[in-house]
């Protein structure tokens, strides 16, 4: 990955710092499935790209709390949002969507 490419953790860290928050300030606002705040170590691991968010709900919380576009965070996390996954697309529809996302047709028809 090039040095100028943003990662999920990098985006979270940058947004947190822009708000002037310490790790504990953000960690207290993002809840696990059991409704407890995430740990400082877990957040630190996420910010340093050693761990990924454990659920869609957590990606959404980071987006909402930090004011980051949800789709951008899903992209950085390497995930598709639930509403996209629920579409039950065919192989052809997915291929066409990926071509559009990439900005044009791929060379050759094989998988890359």
Segments predicted by a language model, with ranges:
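Short, basic-rich loop-to-helix N-cap that marks the start of a DNA-contacting helix
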Residues: 20, 37, 48-64
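Residues within the alpha-helical elements of helix-turn-helix
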Residues: 18, 29, 65
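Short C-terminal boundary/hinge segments that cap the last helix of small helical domains
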Residues: 54-56, 60, 64-84
